[in-house]
Amino acid sequence: MSPEHQATQKVAQRLVDLCSVGKNLDALKELYADSARHVEVMEGPGCARIIEGKKTLLEKAEKFAKTTQIHSASCGKPMVNGDQFVCQMSLDCTASEGPMANQRMTMSEVALYTVKNGKITEGKFFYSMGC
């Protein structure tokens, strides 16, 4: 196993460990590069498709935490390939704002992360849009 693979595995496992116990904000603070970005499938209400910078990602995550009741969450075992890893994530929640306000929903996605110098530099998220 290459040093790059080992470093990515370490970051991947730490992300899963934190997210599995609801410490998503801690994961962002600890594991993300300052210049990290997220790429979503599409824009959402009040949310751009591409979000740049750790500070902006933290602001988005903090708003989500304040406006969403989490009933349960899960994060699958990470699968690593070089400087990237994927994992399956699920969330059972009720939003207090937006088009899905007060409706309980289950969200499931596959996340593809890229790691450079021991930090997550990009997260791409894949999910079905009900098509």
PLM features: residue spans?
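Short beta-strand edge/turn micro-motifs at domain boundaries
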Residues: 106-131
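A short hydrophobic beta-strand element
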Residues: 81-93
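Basic/polar N-terminal segments that are highly enriched at the extreme N-terminus
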Residues: 1-10, 131
